Amino acid sequence: MKYQLTAHEARVIGCLLEKQVTTPEQYPLSVNAVVTACNQKTNREPVMSLSEGEVQTLLDTLVKRHYLRTVSGFGNRVTKYEQRFCNSEFGDLKLSAGEVAVVTTLLLRGAQTPGELRSRAQRMHEFSDMAEVESVLEGLATREDGPFVARLPREPGKRESRYMHLFCDDMDTLITTVEALSPLEDDDDLRARVEALEGEVAELKARLDSLLHHLGD
């Protein structure tokens, strides 16, 4: 995988992507602003508590890797940072507004269903319907320069499958684990087997009731 981010690096990039769209008047961000964004109690899963020193180290590393760049001058004595992760002049990763919203939300909140993504990403991009969200996810999962997202097996009792991003360095291991845990049968096969078993149980119960009735006579 080309993009090998740690969880903390993913949080920093996600925050810069988010603030670039939602609060452009405050962008680029200072170190203090990045710390505040990383440690937000809302719209973050998991909630982190990164120190200024930790964030500065992350920023320096990401600048060296050309995922961020520093911005100074024009009367600003404080160094600020802007993302070059996607849609930058010389970068390879080009994303639509909908793709940026989905990727950012996944970076900040982990695996989510299409419904959750549509609701949580609406400040960055207003999806017209669920079909648009699913189309964006499908595109990110099948890109020639990707894949950038993957669908997880549906959890028991859940109507929707969750999707995860593939930008972190431990994702290959996670995908292997998920595939090993995936059910061998799809939902339709499992449902058919359950219905067949329920029918057999009902038939056995009826035969038992009939037998008990005859014994009672």
From Swiss-Prot:
One Pfam family, short name: DUF480
Which family is this protein grouped under? Belongs to the UPF0502 family.
Q: What is this protein called?
A: UPF0502 protein KPK_3478
Species annotation:
Klebsiella pneumoniae (strain 342)
